[in-house]
Structure formats: structure tokens, C-alpha cells
């Protein structure tokens, strides 16, 4: 069965999609507790660590990299991985830092596997959305999927 629905972050308008906002999601800079000597708030600083994230079109990657450019902050390199779970495991293994939605790392932050690093006075946010193609029938399975997604974001 093919679902033609998905969860994503708002980056513009698309009249071909029926969208439901799931709410604002805060972003957090995370590292392992062993990471040392990094500062992403001091302008002009070089951090000898890797930035671990997914593809270049990722909205939270774009926000992080734009902020670093504004602050003239650099990192050793960027490691691109396909899944958030892989990113979290590499960060926990002290390979580098990442900038992710808080809900994606909440469990690891609570357990102490990851720590939040200072990144600014206010946390930046993104709008999570669920969408499906406009004008297409919504199957019972897709309707259930959309309900589950909405309930998990409301509860979260």
C-alpha cells in the first residue's frame, strides 16, 4: 500500500497539498556529554568538531548553517546521514554535534545520553505539518495515519 501523505516542515505554500499544521517545534543543538571546548554563541570561533545532519535541503540544517554564517562560526566538517536515528547515535558516540527538533531528541536529553548546548537566547522554531495531495481521495488507512500523527503531536 502506498501512502501519499507525510509530515514535513513548512517552507512555503503549495496549492496542490491539503495541509494541517501540527504546531511549532523548537530546535535544539545537541552533543554527547563528553564533547568539550565547543561554543556556538561566540562570533568568529572555530569549533573542532563535526556537524552531523541530513540533506542540504533540510530546513533545520539551513537555519543552523545560516546562523553560523551570520556569527562567522565554523566547524571541522559536515557529515550527512539519511536518518535522524543514525544522527543521534553518532552524536551520542561523540562524533560531533547536531541541530534537531527537540521532540526528536527528547528521550536522549532526559536520559542524559545527549546534552543541549547553548545556541542563542531564544530557541528557534519550525512549523511541523501533515499534508496530502489536494483533490485525491483519503483512504481509511491514510485517515487513521493522519489522526495518529495529529494525536501524537498534540500529546507531545
Spans of model-derived segments:
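Secondary-structure junction motif
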Residues: 37-38, 49-71, 138-142, 146, ...
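Hydrophobic hinge/microswitch elements
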Residues: 65-117
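Hydrophobic residues within well-ordered alpha-helices
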Residues: 1, 46, 89-95, 130
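A late-sequence structural motif
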Residues: 117-156
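Short helix-loop capping/hinge motifs at secondary-structure junctions, enriched
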Residues: 14, 34-42, 135-140
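Short beta-strand-centered segments that line the small-molecule binding cleft or hinge
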Residues: 1-27, 31, 39-40, 92
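Short beta-strand->loop
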Residues: 18-23, 27-28, 111-124
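Beta->alpha turn/N-cap motifs
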Residues: 7-12, 32-33, 83, 100-104
Amino acid at each position: 500500500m502506498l501512502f501519499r501523505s507525510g509530515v514535513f516542515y513548512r517552507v512555503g505554500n503549495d496549492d496542490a497539498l491539503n495541509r494541517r499544521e501540527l504546531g511549532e517545534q523548537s530546535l535544539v543543538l545537541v552533543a554527547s556529554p563528553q564533547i568539550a571546548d565547543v561554543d556556538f554563541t561566540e562570533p568568529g570561533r572555530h569549533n573542532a568538531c563535526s556537524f552531523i545532519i541530513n540533506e542540504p535541503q533540510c530546513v533545520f540544517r539551513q537555519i543552523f548553517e545560516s546562523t553560523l554564517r551570520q556569527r562567522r562560526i565554523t566547524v571541522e566538517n559536515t557529515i550527512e546521514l539519511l536518518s535522524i536515528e543514525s544522527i543521534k547515535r553518532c552524536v551520542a558516540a561523540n562524533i560531533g554535534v547536531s541541530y534537531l527538533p527537540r521532540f526528536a531528541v527528547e528521550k536522549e536529553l532526559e536520559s542524559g545520553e545527549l546534552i543541549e548546548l547553548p545556541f542563542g537566547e531564544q530557541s528557534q522554531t519550525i512549523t511541523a505539518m501533515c499534508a496530502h495531495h489536494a483533490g485525491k481521495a483519503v483512504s481509511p488507512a491514510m485517515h487513521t495515519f493522519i489522526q495518529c500523527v495529529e494525536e501524537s503531536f498534540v500529546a507531545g
